[in-house]
Design a protein with these regions (language model features):
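Short, intrinsically disordered, charge-balanced linker/junction segments flanking boundaries
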Residues: 1-2, 217-222
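Low-complexity, intrinsically disordered
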Residues: 165, 182, 201-218
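Long, amphipathic coiled-coil "stalk"/hairpin helices in large membrane-associated assemblies
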Residues: 3-7, 15-77, 160-165, 172-174, ...
């Protein structure tokens, strides 16, 4: 009688699925091939950068400028060697012709050849060093020697970490920035054993960061 008065009806027991929300924590994980550590092979002082964690970067854009006296010295050494190489090549060709006509001794010719080859090796090695700091040896001249060099973004992606500040000297082995290519990004989530049965491959997940909880990202368990 009381059930009727309360307008409550009863029926047979049924097995129903009840939805629930499971909140779990984790961290963003990226395959090694999608992570890039940016360093300066010859070291130097960080002159400028605008990078912050989370910023988007485009491949080829300037992400930092470095400054050091050794950059000037390297450019000077290359241009000096290049100039000496030009005359060494001329002298080598001259001594070669003289030697063929027996107007010059083998010793003089061989010395000219050795000098030319040595300078050619030195020039090539210095040119490769210039490429390491993003200076094109083919366009370098006495008119555009600079104590500053740019660092360019090697990938399209996001800044994961900034490990340096303006004015700091960085060694060749130091990492300035860590970048992420998000094309294969995934979440590494930690789940309690009692909750494992609540999850399944293909299940949809809604993810967000503590810094930006309003920005939700649709994910899927794989």
């Amino acid at each position: 009688i009381q059930l009727k008065n309360a307008s409550i009806t009863t029926g047979p027991l049924k097995k129903l699925s009840i939805s629930s929300t499971l909140k779990i924590n984790g961290e963003i994980d990226v395959p090694p091939q999608n992570m890039v550590s940016v360093s300066m092979p010859l070291g130097g002082y960080l002159k400028s950068t605008k990078l912050l964690p989370g910023m988007h970067i485009t491949k080829g854009e300037v992400i930092a400028t470095m400054e050091d006296q050794q950059y000037i010295q390297l450019q000077q050494d290359f241009l000096t060697t290049k100039s000496r190489l030009y005359f060494a090549e001329k002298e080598y060709e001259r001594q070669k012709e003289l030697n063929q006509s027996q107007a010059s001794s083998d010793k003089v010719y061989q010395q000219a050849e050795a000098d030319y080859k040595t300078l050619r090796i030195t020039s090539s090695a210095l040119g490769e060093k210039l490429k390491l700091i993003n200076i094109n040896p083919n366009t370098l001249s006495e008119k555009n020697i600079s104590k500053s060099v740019n660092i360019y973004a090697p990938i399209n992606g996001f800044v994961s970490k900034v490990d340096v500040n303006i004015g700091k000297y960085v060694n060749p082995a130091d990492v300035l920035f860590e970048l992420i290519n998000p094309t294969d990004i995934h979440l590494n989530l930690k789940v309690f054993e009692k909750d494992v049965t609540k999850l399944a491959i293909g299940q949809k997940v809604l993810a967000y960061t503590n810094n930006q909880p309003e920005n939700k990202h649709n994910c899927e368990i794989i």
